[in-house]
């Protein structure tokens, strides 16, 4: 079968934009509500969000999650947004309420930080119908308990150790959806994909 040519239109004014590494297209992707997502931009910068070709946005930032911020990001984005709802300093009832609010705003999923308790993951899963995404920062974490608590996807963010963590998770849980940081270049991205990541977060 011959490969079909894909017509491209970049325009003039929008031609200057951020293009993610093409090798990300090699991962399987994760299908959410009928949309297949392979590349996820890690940013809350509205100018970048409007000028990047990622399939989705992950809006996690080092401050207490605020509905006004998630609403702004979701409102400006042309692609699905995964919203951080805490799990460290912000947790418990507040994280549960933030998850409900994020779903009502149109988020495609909620992301919880590594320190969050399994109890709160379960409580969030009970009240939202969008994916609950648990952040994994070490292969020493109890992955099984996260999944059993209700985490639908795993978000692996282990810096240089990310491929190793992904590989270990994939060996134990062949079917769990994994999104993972791809690192600074195509070599590290491909290593993460070959380790078993279904989607790549990029910053």
Residue ranges and their predicted role:
Residues 61-78, 90-95, 113-129, 139-143, ...:
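Active-site-adjacent beta->alpha loops and helix N-cap segments on the catalytic face
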Residues 1-83, 87-93, 104:
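Conserved N-terminal beta1-alpha1 strand-loop-helix module at the mouth
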Residues 93-102, 141-149, 184-202:
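Catalytic cores of alpha/beta
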Residues 105-116, 152-165, 195-203:
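Glycine-rich phosphate-binding active-site loops on the catalytic face of alpha/beta enzymes
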Residues 28-36, 56-59, 81-85, 110-112, ...:
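Hydrophobic faces of well-ordered beta-strands that scaffold small-molecule active sites
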Residues 83, 101, 108-114, 124:
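Glycine- and small hydrophobic-enriched segments that form the cores of compact globular domains
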Residues 2-16, 28, 179, 185-203:
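Alpha/beta catalytic cores of nucleotide-metabolism and tRNA/nucleoside-modifying enzymes
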């Amino acid at each position: 079968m011959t490969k079909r040519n894909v017509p491209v239109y970049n325009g003039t004014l929008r031609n200057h934009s951020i293009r993610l590494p093409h090798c990300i297209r090699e991962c399987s992707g994760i299908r959410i509500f009928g949309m297949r997502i392979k590349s996820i931009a890690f940013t809350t910068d509205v100018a970048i969000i409007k000028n990047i070709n990622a399939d989705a946005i992950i809006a996690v930032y080092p401050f207490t999650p605020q509905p006004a911020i998630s609403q702004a990001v979701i409102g400006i984005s042309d692609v699905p947004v995964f919203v951080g709802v805490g799990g460290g300093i912000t947790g418990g009832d507040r994280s549960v309420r933030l998850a409900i609010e994020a779903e009502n705003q149109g988020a495609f999923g909620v992301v919880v930080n590594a320190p969050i308790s399994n109890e709160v993951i379960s409580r969030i899963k009970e009240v939202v119908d969008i994916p609950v995404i648990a952040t994994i920062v070490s292969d020493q974490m109890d992955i099984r308990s996260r999944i059993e608590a209700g985490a639908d996807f795993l978000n692996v963010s282990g810096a240089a150790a990310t491929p190793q963590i992904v590989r270990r998770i994939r060996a134990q849980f062949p079917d769990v959806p994994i999104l993972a940081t791809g690192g600074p270049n195509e070599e590290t991205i491909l290593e993460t994909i070959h380790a078993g990541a279904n989607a790549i977060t990029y910053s």
